[in-house]
Amino acid sequence: MSDTKTAPAYDTPIGLTNPPIDELLERTSSKYALVIYAAKRARQINDYYNQLGDGILEYVGPLVEPGLQEKPLSVALREIHADLLEHSEGE
């Protein structure tokens, strides 16, 4: 008997695998700078969503169209990949 199992088919992954890490690293001086850069932007996106109910518009929302349940870090990485943000070292 041949009992072969195939891997389940998934949609194209987004977030930490898409955009590719190698392409993201081309936009910063080191992997550590990329982590800080993406984390700060993800925090801004998260704060933007938290302030919406209060009517305060202090933070800038996502610059790319977020997916239905896409995390702020994934959105931040896609913004970095699309060169929608300016970053300077030491901020």
UniProtKB/Swiss-Prot annotation:
Q: Name the top EC class.
A: transferase
Tell me its EC number(s), please.
2.7.7.6
Please give the family membership noted in the entry: Belongs to the RNA polymerase subunit omega family.
One matching Pfam family: RNA_pol_Rpb6
The entry's cellular-component GO terms read: DNA-directed RNA polymerase complex
Q: Which species does the entry assign this protein to?
A: Nocardia farcinica (strain IFM 10152)
> What NCBIfam families does the annotation carry?
rpoZ
HAMAP family this protein is in?
RNApol_bact_RpoZ
Q: What does this protein do?
A: Promotes RNA polymerase assembly. Latches the N- and C-terminal regions of the beta' subunit thereby facilitating its interaction with the beta and alpha subunits.
Q: Name one GO biological process term.
A: DNA-templated transcription
Q: What is this protein called?
A: DNA-directed RNA polymerase subunit omega
On assembly, the entry states: The RNAP catalytic core consists of 2 alpha, 1 beta, 1 beta' and 1 omega subunit. When a sigma factor is associated with the core the holoenzyme is formed, which can initiate transcription.
The signal peptide here is: none
SUPFAM superfamilies in the record: RPB6/omega subunit-like
The intrachain disulfides are none
Which of UniProt's keywords are assigned here?
Answer: DNA-directed RNA polymerase, Nucleotidyltransferase, Transcription, Transferase
InterPro entries in UniProt: DNA-dir_RNA_pol_omega, Pol_omega/Rpo6/RPB6, RPB6/omega-like_sf
What is the catalytic activity of this protein? RNA(n) + a ribonucleoside 5'-triphosphate = RNA(n+1) + diphosphate
GO MF terms listed in the record are: DNA binding; DNA-directed RNA polymerase activity
The record's gene field reads rpoZ
